Amino acid sequence: MKLAHWMYAGPAHIGTLRVASSFKNVHAIMHAPLGDDYFNVMRSMLERERNFTPATASIVDRHVLARGSRKRVVDNILRKDKEESPDLIILTPTCTSSILQEDLKNFVDRASIISDCNVIFADVDHYQVNEIQAADRTLEQVVRYYLDKSHTLDQFVTDAPSVNIIGILTLGFHNRHDCRELRRLLKDLDIRINQIIPEGGSVEDPKNLPKARFNLIPYREVGLMTAMYLNKEFGMPYVSTTPMGAVDMAECIRQIKKSLDILAAPILSSKRVDYESYIDGQTRFVSQAAWFSRSIDCQNFTGKETVVFGDATHAASITKILAREMGIRVSCTGTYCKHDAEWFKEQIKDFCDEMIITDDHAEVGDIIARVEPSAIFGTQMERHIGKRLEIPCGVISAPAHIQNFSLGYRPFLGYEGTNQIADLVYNSFALGMEDHLLEIFCGHDTKEIMTKSLSTDISPIWDPESRQELGKIPRFVRDEVKINTEKFARQKGLLNVTVEVMHAAKEALS
């Protein structure tokens, strides 16, 4: 565990809750003190769901500390079983309640004897892993639980080409849009989708996972452990190349073809898809990104520097797109997924000047300040850093704020995703003529303190000391302070604003 003002990846219980609330008819109970139960509000705000988030807090308070948690935890499990009739209840502690070192697994075993639904304890080390690792582990645990429970499995794969998409979940960065784009891609390739988990899936679905011919893992962060388990237990091949960008899209499609050819079972398909012709047609005519990268607009980016930072999947993919497909220099790229550092380094070693593996936003901010790039592509934190340094930033990875949970269709994967990324890159830079005009006219985004007054009265003159004092006031109240001070000065018949006048105005308005 780590005490920090801000973190890229949240605590482990958030990952477990994300997986639980992605499945249909699954309820999560977190054994937590007040303050750790913010997930419900966060998910409702960002995902803008109509339904309530299926998560309940079993509060750790002074009574629990005095008597122990067993009765309260078991009672909460049985109450939710009766009220919601879920297929599964997942119990998880938080990093705070884990300090109590209670045997919650024993409480789950006791409750599962009495309850009508299945109950499992999230087997996650809250001291060692973060939100992403916990989500990956919890999904694998749920799949393993239901496959172990189904002793007699129909091991025959489907006659038609089929796939499981593993790793689409709630609060994922553009995950729902990406899922729609993957559906369209697989339909074009005449591949039937067997299961999509966990988002929108039922916990009864995992027992049918082995029927698919292969598994597709769009993001390394969640789903890879499940795919590796299915590969080990059932010999199912999996594709983990993220279909982001024209080059990796082509590579992903070729790996899909290779995975379909692995199994000896004959494929009965209504049509034979020429994969190479499909790649060529989509790259040349559907995706506008390939054409755009050769246009004069994209050539204007030559020589401009960028910094990329995000989760391993998105940071690596965006770095390769910028350097390989758009010819933009990536001065530094990095990820906060320290557990996946080796894979990340291998992916981007030929596409950037330097790399950073850290979960400390201050280090990232220092690098951005040193490099002074023309644009940043990162998370919500890099967006804040960019605003402070007056550098434009495109958000390409979680964690993100509500503006990146768009209602409109904005995938990052697939051929439509290449268009979205090209737009994001183009709009994140100051355009060529815009740069030129800013130089000529000394910039339109002046740092001078502006007034919003429509009055025709002559404004009092601010002396250098008072201007410096005004500049120290936070921006969100600065204009109001300026207007109130000038109004006070006019009422007193003063032509000059000094620091003393500012203090007098403040006292008069207090």
From Swiss-Prot:
Subcellular location: Plastid, Chloroplast
Keyword field: 4Fe-4S, ATP-binding, Chlorophyll biosynthesis, Chloroplast, Iron, Iron-sulfur, Metal-binding, Nucleotide-binding, Oxidoreductase, Photosynthesis, Plastid
GO molecular function: 4 iron, 4 sulfur cluster binding; ATP binding; metal ion binding; oxidoreductase activity, acting on iron-sulfur proteins as donors; oxidoreductase activity, acting on the CH-CH group of donors, iron-sulfur protein as acceptor
Reactions catalysed, as given in the entry: chlorophyllide a + oxidized 2[4Fe-4S]-[ferredoxin] + 2 ADP + 2 phosphate = protochlorophyllide a + reduced 2[4Fe-4S]-[ferredoxin] + 2 ATP + 2 H2O
Cofactor note: Binds 1 [4Fe-4S] cluster per heterodimer. The cluster is bound at the heterodimer interface by residues from both subunits.
Binding site for [4Fe-4S] cluster: D36
Leading EC class: oxidoreductase
Gene Ontology CC annotation, any one: chloroplast
Cofactor(s) needed for function: [4Fe-4S] cluster
Annotated catalytic residues: D297
Protein EC: 1.3.7.7
Pathway(s) the chain acts in: Porphyrin-containing compound metabolism; chlorophyll biosynthesis (light-independent)
InterPro entries reported for this sequence: ChlB/BchB/BchZ, LI-POR_suB-like_C, Nase/OxRdtase_comp1, P-CP_red_C, Protochl_reductB, Protochlorophyllide_Rdtase
GO biological process: light-independent chlorophyll biosynthetic process; photosynthesis, dark reaction
HAMAP family, sorted: ChlB_BchB
Entries under PANTHER family matching the protein: LIGHT-INDEPENDENT PROTOCHLOROPHYLLIDE REDUCTASE SUBUNIT B (PTHR33712:SF7)
Annotated family: Belongs to the ChlB/BchB/BchZ family.
Quaternary structure, from the entry: Protochlorophyllide reductase is composed of three subunits; ChlL, ChlN and ChlB. Forms a heterotetramer of two ChlB and two ChlN subunits.
The protein's role, per its UniProt record: Component of the dark-operative protochlorophyllide reductase (DPOR) that uses Mg-ATP and reduced ferredoxin to reduce ring D of protochlorophyllide (Pchlide) to form chlorophyllide a (Chlide). This reaction is light-independent. The NB-protein (ChlN-ChlB) is the catalytic component of the complex.
Name of the featured protein: Light-independent protochlorophyllide reductase subunit B
Species name: Pinus koraiensis (Korean pine)
Gene this protein is translated from: chlB
